[in-house]
């Protein structure tokens, strides 16, 4: 007979090289794929695990992408919708780099201000700049027009 802990395990094969994004809040894996521009026809082998138990955050999603390493801009965007996420870089089936994401104090040029009157929406040269007010829940303040945006606003922009 299989023990309870063995029955509850979810097995997804290891990847030889690529990226594993772990500890994504449940239900956010599809938004992560959207950030990465993965729609399914790019040729990457992708494993998507959604809504599994996690000791760290209750329920979580996991994304594994073979033969793809994410860049800093992508990691910064993922941080905004999954601040508890961990990015693992895999080489020869071994984690060679592990990064715990953190929401930065300043966010520049990654997202747009939703205020149509904001200078960043009316001047091509103006780069959006936000200050992080809180992380849980995510609350950002535009440095130009002082409007506040939430995690849900960021997700709407991504989707």
From Swiss-Prot:
What's the cofactor? Zn(2+)
GO terms assigned for molecular function: metal ion binding
Can you name a GO cellular component term? aspartate carbamoyltransferase complex
Which Pfam families does this entry report, sorted A to Z? Answer: PyrI (PF01948), PyrI_C (PF02748)
Q: Which residue ranges run through the membrane?
A: none
Give me the residues that bind Zn(2+), please: 113, 118, 142, 145
Q: What does this protein's record comment on cofactor binding?
A: Binds 1 zinc ion per subunit.
State what this protein does: Involved in allosteric regulation of aspartate carbamoyltransferase.
| Record-linked NCBIfam families | ATCase_reg (TIGR00240)
The record's section on HAMAP family has: Asp_carb_tr_reg
Quaternary structure note? Contains catalytic and regulatory chains.
Q: What is this protein called?
A: Aspartate carbamoyltransferase regulatory chain
This chain's source organism reads Saccharolobus islandicus (strain L.S.2.15 / Lassen #1)
